[in-house]
Amino acid sequence: MKKNFRVKREKDFKAIFKEGTSFANRKFVVYQLENQKNRFRVGLSVSKKLGNAVTRNQIKRRIRHIIQNAKGSLVEDVDFVVIARKGVETLGYAEMEKNLLHVLKLSKIYREGNGSEKETKVD
């Protein structure tokens, strides 16, 4: 994912947390805030409690890959931050994708293209 699609500055993170709305499931929390740009931007947060640097970076790479694959179905004009919760480090890629897309659907950031995919429900 290109750098202009990422939230990088602390000021931007703070604004999203303070002024944005949050949505969550058991594995992820998503904060979102509308922006005036013509594209979405995403920030990632993975706590040190989830594991060592290798584990945290693997989680971030997987999240970026899932978002890259869903890029065409994500709404524009929104900044959002994905926070990984405890337990996400034990998930495989498919289960992580299912959980992340579920919380993005809750927040209405992700909209299914032609409706060919079945609805997924996560505990």
Curated annotation (Swiss-Prot):
Example of a GO cellular component annotation carried by this entry: ribonuclease P complex
Annotated keywords: Endonuclease, Hydrolase, Nuclease, RNA-binding, tRNA processing
EC number(s) per entry: 3.1.26.5
One Pfam short name: Ribonuclease_P
GO biological process, alphabetically ordered: tRNA 5'-leader removal
Signal peptide stretch: none
HAMAP family: RNase_P (MF_00227)
Function summary: RNaseP catalyzes the removal of the 5'-leader sequence from pre-tRNA to produce the mature 5'-terminus. It can also cleave other RNA substrates such as 4.5S RNA. The protein component plays an auxiliary but essential role in vivo by binding to the 5'-leader sequence and broadening the substrate specificity of the ribozyme.
Protein name as annotated: Ribonuclease P protein component
Lineage, broadest ranks: Bacteria, Bacillati, Bacillota, Bacilli, Lactobacillales
Name of the gene encoding the protein in the UniProt record: rnpA
